[in-house]
Amino acid sequence: MKKTPLLNSQVSQAVATIGHFDLLTINDAGMPIPNDERRIDLAVTKALPRFIDVLETVVTEMEIQKIYLAEEIKMHNPDQLKAIKGLIAEDVEIEFIPHSQMKEYLSHPLNKGNVRTGEITPFSNIILESNVTF
């Protein structure tokens, strides 16, 4: 059995294939994720699993250089924004973009996976951009 915190095989496989500048998204239940091979649906019911719990686990296995968040999270979900900032290393760049642009990244060529959680709070979506470990 795997010794690290991330047990889901699909999420683990997506992280394992990531190279420098590649992307992984973690999303709330309402994000319109394309139904393709990159879709990883973890949602069981409302709020299960929570976005922040999935993010907390993924960051243990992924070297991140930059994150993208919806500009709208500042006004509509400041508690989630605070929680995200608490999990992300201080040297990681944060870029705020319109939510409509976040949706475009779901099909971006560098995107290795779109994780759907059971999160039901607004704008609980993040794009993680990979760094190298050396």
From Swiss-Prot:
Keyword annotations: Carbohydrate metabolism, Cytoplasm, Isomerase
A GO term from the CC aspect: cytosol
Coiled coil spans: none
Location within or outside the cell: Cytoplasm
EC number: 5.4.99.62
GO molecular function: D-ribose pyranase activity; intramolecular lyase activity; monosaccharide binding
Residues engaged in binding substrate: D28, H99, F123, S124, N125
Catalytic residues, chain numbering: H20
Example GO BP: D-ribose catabolic process
Pathway in which this enzyme or protein is active: Carbohydrate metabolism; D-ribose degradation; D-ribose 5-phosphate from beta-D-ribopyranose: step 1/2
EC primary class: isomerase
Location (main, coarse): cytoplasm
Pfam families referenced in this protein's UniProt entry, alphabetically: RbsD_FucU (PF05025)
Organism superkingdom: Bacteria
Keyword Cytoplasm belongs to the record: yes
Catalyses which reaction(s): beta-D-ribopyranose = beta-D-ribofuranose
Oligomer status and interactors: Homodecamer.
Function: Catalyzes the interconversion of beta-pyran and beta-furan forms of D-ribose.
Family according to the record: Belongs to the RbsD / FucU family. RbsD subfamily.
NCBIfam families the record matches: PRK11797.1
Protein name, as recorded: D-ribose pyranase
UniProt organism field: Staphylococcus carnosus (strain TM300)
